[in-house]
Amino acid sequence: MPKAMQAMERLGVPKRIVGFVMPTGYSFNLDGSMIFLAVSSVFIAQAAEATTGQHMGLGQQLTMMLAFMVTSKGLAGVPRASILVLLATMNTFLPANLGAMGVAILLGIDALMDMGRSAVNLMGNCLATVVIARWEGEFDDNRARVFGTPAEAELDLRSGDVAFAEAVRQGD
């Protein structure tokens, strides 16, 4: 998170907005985790239907999505936390340990899926930071234009921000 926060400041988002939105986003803006929960739950429900013949109706699926929206707010910032929320919620909606068996199928690829969830969560938080800075009228368009170019270090030196200029030169 510190590297992402520094990158958002270098992009032109004020430090006070970065300091509020990024940490808050890691608790409440978990786009990647919600996408995983939605797709995985439908996969497990379809696998359970093939096994038991019991169809999960639209109303039950919508109720399950609402449950995921509530339970995902308590996700910890640790690897593979989403799989535990998936397990707990699926056991509520599916009979006789079918949820656990479905989650067991996903465990084989969860390490890769977790990297994808983390990347989507990070991109969502960075996007939210930029959107809020623009909304507040405090986004620095000039800084964004030179972000990641050699001109960024020159702009930092002219504004007296030696630390950012050094970070640009080192490639951080």
Located regions from the model:
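Internal, well-ordered alpha-helical scaffold/interface segments
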Residues: P2, Q6, G19-M22, V42
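Short helical (or helix-break) motifs at transmembrane helix termini and adjacent helical loops
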Residues: M1-M8, D114, N125
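Membrane-water interface at loop-to-transmembrane-helix junctions
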Residues: R16-L30
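Conserved helix-loop functional segments at active or binding sites
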Residues: R10, S27-L30, A50, T92
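Transmembrane alpha-helical segments and their cytosolic interface motifs
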Residues: G32-I35
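Transmembrane alpha-helical segments and their short flanking loops
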Residues: A38-D172
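Selected transmembrane alpha-helices and immediately adjacent juxtamembrane segments
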Residues: A7-R10, N142
